[in-house]
C-alpha cells in the first residue's frame, strides 16, 4: 500500500525476576506483514530469574545459555521498531518488559480493537484473549502447546488479525491504519 508506514508485529515472553517475580523480558519475536521472522531471540533479563513461567512463556533454563543480554537485545529491538506501526496484543506489557515508553510509537493493539471484537461476536466482553480472537477470526488454535507459548506464533496471529481489521475498515469505509502522518 503506497504511502504507508511499514508494519511489524511484536510479541514478548517474560519470566519472573527476584523475590516478587516481577516480569523480565526473556524472548522477543518480530515478524513482518507476511509473517516472516525479522527478530527472534532469547534474552537474558537483568536480575535473578526466580520463575521461568515455562508453561506460559516456553522459556527454560537452557534457553538462557548464550542468550542475548537485555541491554543489547533492547537496542536491537527498538531499532527495528523505529518509525514503524507496531502490532501486538496487550502491547503495554511488552513495552514495559522492554523498559520503553510506548507513547513514542504508533501502535495497533488487538486487545483494544472493538471493531475486531464485534467481528468475532465478542463485543460484550471486558477483555478478549489473543487465543480466542485467533480461534474466532483466524480459525486457528494457538497457545495450546504443553511447552508454552511461541512468541513467533503469537506475533504472526496479531499480524493476521491486524490485516483482518484493515479489511473490515476498508469494507465499512472507515479510515485504514498505518497511513503516514
UniProtKB/Swiss-Prot annotation:
Function comment: Interferon-induced antiviral exoribonuclease that acts mainly on single-stranded RNA. Exhibits antiviral activity against RNA viruses including hepatitis C virus (HCV), hepatitis A virus (HAV) and yellow fever virus (YFV). Inhibition of several viruses such as chikungunya virus (CHIKV) does not involve the degradation of viral RNAs, but rather the inhibition of translation of viral proteins. Exerts a translational control over a large panel of non-self RNA substrates while sparing endogenous transcripts.
Native organism taxonomy: Eukaryota, Metazoa, Chordata, Craniata, Vertebrata
GO CC terms in record: Cajal body; cytoplasm; nucleolus; nucleoplasm; nucleus; P-body; PML body
Main location: nucleus
InterPro entries to which the protein is assigned, alphabetical: Exonuclease_RNaseT/DNA_pol3, REXO1/3/4-like, RNaseH-like_sf, RNaseH_sf
Name of the gene encoding the protein in the UniProt record: ISG20
SUPFAM superfamilies: Ribonuclease H-like
Cofactor note: Binds 2 manganese ions per subunit.
Known partners and oligomeric status: Associates with PML and SP100 in the PML NB complex. Associates with survival motor neuron protein (SMN)-containing macromolecular nuclear complexes and U1 and U2 snRNAs and U3 snoRNA.
Family note: Belongs to the exonuclease superfamily.
Keyword rRNA processing assigned: yes
UniProt GO molecular function: 3'-5'-RNA exonuclease activity; exonuclease activity; exoribonuclease II activity; metal ion binding; single-stranded DNA 3'-5' DNA exonuclease activity; U1 snRNA binding; U2 snRNA binding; U3 snoRNA binding
Compartment annotation: Nucleus; Nucleus, Nucleolus; Cytoplasm; Nucleus, Cajal body
Pfam family, one: RNase_T
Superkingdom: Eukaryota
Name of the protein in its database record: Interferon-stimulated gene 20 kDa protein
Tissue-level expression: Highly expressed in peripheral blood leukocytes, spleen, thymus, colon and lung. Up regulated by E2 in estrogen receptor-positive breast cancer lines.
Enzyme Commission number(s) of this protein: 3.1.13.1
Binding site for Mn(2+) 2: 90, 93
Reactions catalysed according to its record: Exonucleolytic cleavage in the 3'- to 5'-direction to yield nucleoside 5'-phosphates
pH effect summary: Optimum pH is 7.0.
Induction of synthesis: Induced by interferons alpha and beta. Weaker induction was seen with interferon gamma. Increased expression was seen at the transcriptional level.
Residues the entry annotates as binding Mn(2+) 1: 11, 13, 154
Keywords, ordered alphabetically: Antiviral defense, Cytoplasm, Exonuclease, Hydrolase, Immunity, Innate immunity, Manganese, Metal-binding, Nuclease, Nucleus, RNA-binding, rRNA processing
Enzyme class: hydrolase
Annotated source species: Homo sapiens
Any single GO BP term: rRNA processing
Known cofactor(s): Mn(2+)
Amino acid at each position: 500500500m503506497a504511502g504507508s508506514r511499514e508494519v511489524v508485529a511484536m510479541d514478548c515472553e517474560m519470566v519472573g525476576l527476584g523475590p516478587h517475580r516481577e516480569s523480565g523480558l526473556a524472548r522477543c519475536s518480530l515478524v513482518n506483514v507476511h509473517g516472516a521472522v525479522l527478530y527472534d531471540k532469547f534474552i537474558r533479563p537483568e536480575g535473578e530469574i526466580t520463575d521461568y513461567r515455562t508453561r506460559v512463556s516456553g522459556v527454560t533454563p537452557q534457553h538462557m545459555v548464550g542468550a542475548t543480554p537485555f541491554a543489547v537485545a533492547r537496542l536491537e529491538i527498538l531499532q527495528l521498531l523505529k518509525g514503524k506501526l507496531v502490532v501486538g496484543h496487550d502491547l503495554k506489557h511488552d513495552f514495559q518488559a522492554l523498559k520503553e515508553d510506548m507513547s513514542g510509537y504508533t501502535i495497533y493493539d488487538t486487545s483494544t480493537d472493538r471493531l475486531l471484537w464485534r467481528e468475532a461476536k465478542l463485543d460484550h466482553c471486558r477483555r478478549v484473549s489473543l487465543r480466542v480472537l485467533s480461534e474466532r477470526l483466524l480459525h486457528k488454535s494457538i497457545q495450546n502447546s504443553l511447552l508454552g507459548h511461541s512468541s513467533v506464533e503469537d506475533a504472526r496471529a496479531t499480524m493476521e488479525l491486524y490485516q483482518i481489521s484493515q479489511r473490515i475498515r476498508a469494507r465499512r469505509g472507515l479510515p485504514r491504519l498505518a497511513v503516514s502522518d
